[in-house]
Regions:
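Feature of Fe-S/electron-transfer and energy-metabolism proteins
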Residues: 1-209
């Protein structure tokens, strides 16, 4: 550290500080103060770097699961679908299909058992969007799947992820277990009449569409 920071070299000219619990006392500019970062409105990535991944109590302290609580006790499944439609939320794949419209296709189905499938297999070479989200903010994924289940009257969710990707697998499995331990998954979620289960399903080296 001293070798690179004590001299006016290219290393120091291109170094930035970031906020953390163990940050060094340095005079480097804070990376969050740069226009390309400070002018961002982070939504899907709002918790990245701000909470310990998989720590449910930090997540809750950062308003995590508050939308789920509101949906379960203040909204009907139909109202949740309409809220998602009105939000303009779209899929993050190539088609950018409206999420609320997709949910509305499943909601009226009267099947006794319905599943919410979450494809984090990410078989494209070099792709890391899904795995990155699992590693940094797994509880937001859990919350979104439960909301999906409530809105579509579904009973269970499977999270597909390729075997061998140990860090994201461990992160989402820990988050799911924490959700079960704290009444956010399983029977009568948060004391409501809605029950929902979730598990990870490991895939082989293949492409899941």
């Amino acid at each position: 550290y001293d070798h690179y920071s004590s001299k006016e070299t290219i290393y120091k000219q291109n170094a930035f500080a970031y906020e953390s619990n163990s940050s060094l006392d340095v005079d480097f500019p804070n990376i969050n103060g740069l226009p390309q970062f400070s002018n961002q409105l982070r939504i899907a990535t709002r918790n990245f770097g701000d909470i310990t991944p998989g720590d449910i109590f930090q997540y809750i302290n950062n308003e995590g699961y508050s939308a789920l609580d509101k949906a379960l006790f203040e909204m009907s499944p139909e109202e949740v679908v309409e809220e998602v439609k009105n939000s303009g939320l779209r899929g993050r794949g190539g088609a950018a299909f409206p999420t609320g419209v997709k949910w509305s296709f499943l909601a009226p189905n009267q099947a006794s058992t319905k599943y919410v499938l979450c494809n984090c297999e990410e078989g494209d070479p070099g792709a890391y969007n899904d795995k990155g989200r699992l590693e940094t903010d797994p509880h937001t994924l859990v919350a979104g799947l439960i909301l999906n289940g409530y809105a579509t009257n579904s009973n269970k969710s499977y999270v597909f992820i390729r075997q061998g990707h140990d860090i994201p697998i461990n992160a989402i499995e820990r988050a799911i277990q924490e959700a079960y331990d704290n009444g956010i998954l399983g029977e009568n979620i948060l004391g409501s009449n809605f029950s929902f289960d979730m598990e990870v399903s490991l895939t082989g080296d293949s492409y899941v569409a």
